[in-house]
Amino acid sequence: MKAFKQKQVWFVTGSQDLYGPKVLEQVAKNSEQIVNGFNQSDAISMEVVYKPTVKSPREIYAVCQAANSDENCVGIILWMHTFSPAKMWIAGLNELSKPFMHLHTQFNAELPWADINMNYMNTHQSAHGCREFGYIGTRMRKERKVVVGHWQTNDVQAQVDDWCRAAAGWNESQNLRIARFGDNMRQVAVTEGDKVAAQIQFGYEVHAYSLGELNDAINAISENDITAQIDRYASEYIISNELFNDEYQLDRLRKEAKIELGLAQFLKDGEFGAFTNCFENLTGMTGLPGLATQRLMANGIGYGGEGDWKTAAMVRIMKVMGQGRVGGTSFMEDYTYNFGATDQVLGAHMLEVCPSIAASKPRLEVHRHTIGVRCDVPRLLFTAKAGPAINVSTIDLGNRFRIILNELDTVTPPQDLPNLPVASALWEPRPNLSIAAAAWIHAGGAHHSAYSQAISTENIVDFAEMAGAELVIIDADTQIRQFKNELRQNSVYYGLARGL
């Protein structure tokens, strides 16, 4: 079973009528075999749909139009089995609004040394057919991923899957709606941004709603629904008997369940995939949602604290991209440092860290929250599982958006944190904290990020290219002088590209 049950990519093979029916029959047969191989592979998370070989400008244009109008198609894989004159592709590529990947492969892995003849050579022409197609993509300045290698290899299938996941994320971005309750935290700069520019570039919509509208949805929740929700908590988390026997704590938990159910219904009714709130805008609320937000994120909803809609969008997009993979994705904040033999970052937030990243079964506890509405708030406590991860931040530079990515190694805390009443993750940024933090700051990265152990750097690279957005990567090879030069060069490139 594929992780993406409805979304699909189309597989389109290019050729031309010059070859005659016998060769074209072989081309179609080979293409179907590749598609079947991809669909039988556990490495590829999305259904690949075979489409008939295109042999003329009209056929190419028609399949591109069809892809545009098919809501389940998130992109197209293009392969030139034989030579397909690239001028035939101009109208179709101009029409195509979905992402495309250029698969530079060959049906047979090895040459039949003793039997090879010109018939074989003329049938298996990807080596120069794909170069012709590559030229027109470059000439037309089309962003695309190029995957090279034999289609049965693990490396090629992994790259295909990375791109499929990015295409699913891009599709989600085009259809995403984000609800904002309240505004940004007052005086904070990095969470601000141009929502119109974001919708033009990324596709997602951001809409503001009053706390009164949200409270109406919360107050519509019945006591029976709240009781059923408490039972779900008891089955999913570690909860002490003391909490259930304490009338006050149980009342706080019931209020939180009511918030969760009301918020979930509001988001469902409005077809929202992400939301933001702010501790400074809680009029009529019994407290800042803690457990409620954590559980909504665990169910796939994107979230950004203090009105951070850009991070809320990225959390949702990355959750979609990561379907079926081990690991989770969460809203996150760089909170405090552990300087030592290996410098580390302790990431957390006031309340809102997603349990999809938890190393073990979370504990549900009620603790005092002292920012905004000062009250006791139920929340899940855990530490993130050890392993590779990434932090991704999207910022608005005024004339463009920049995506910043830092590769991390999450580690198990050396000691328990008995007095820290929030979920957390301890990580070592690559290449080290000194370089990573300096590069992040030079790039203007936010204190909020979308943290993920399910998404790879390649997924974000592919997504950024689909969006036409600047992406800078901080990894094991980063050096500050080169990184600063990259930022300067990017400023020139993206400044010029806007006018070209």
UniProtKB/Swiss-Prot annotation:
List, separated by semicolons, the cofactors it needs: Mn(2+)
Keyword Signal listed? The answer is no
**EC annotation?**
5.3.1.4
Q: Which reaction does it catalyse?
A: beta-L-arabinopyranose = L-ribulose
Nucleus among keywords: no
Which positions bind Mn(2+)?
306, 333, 349, 448
Q: Name one GO biological process term.
A: L-arabinose catabolic process to xylulose 5-phosphate
Keywords of this entry: Arabinose catabolism, Carbohydrate metabolism, Isomerase, Manganese, Metal-binding
List GO molecular-function terms, semicolon-separated.
Answer: L-arabinose isomerase activity; manganese ion binding
Q: Which InterPro entries does the annotation name?
A: Ara_Isoase_C, AraA_central, AraA_N, AraA_N_sf, Fuc/Ara_isomerase_C, Fucose_isomerase_N/cen_sf, Lara_isomerase
Its cellular-component GO annotations read: cytosol
Which SUPFAM superfamilies does this one have?
Answer: FucI/AraA C-terminal domain-like (SSF50443), FucI/AraA N-terminal and middle domains (SSF53743)
Free-text remark on how the cofactor is bound:
Binds 1 Mn(2+) ion per subunit.
Reading the lineage from the top rank, the first entry is Bacteria
- Pathway per the UniProt entry: Carbohydrate degradation; L-arabinose degradation via L-ribulose; D-xylulose 5-phosphate from L-arabinose (bacterial route): step 1/3
NCBIfam families assigned: PRK02929.1 (NF002795)
Give the protein's biological function. Answer: Catalyzes the conversion of L-arabinose to L-ribulose.
Per the similarity annotation, which family is this?
Belongs to the arabinose isomerase family.
From the Swiss-Prot or TrEMBL record, give the protein name: L-arabinose isomerase
**What is the originating organism of this protein?**
Shewanella sp. (strain W3-18-1)
Taxonomic placement: Bacteria, Pseudomonadati, Pseudomonadota, Gammaproteobacteria, Alteromonadales
What is the gene name? Answer: araA
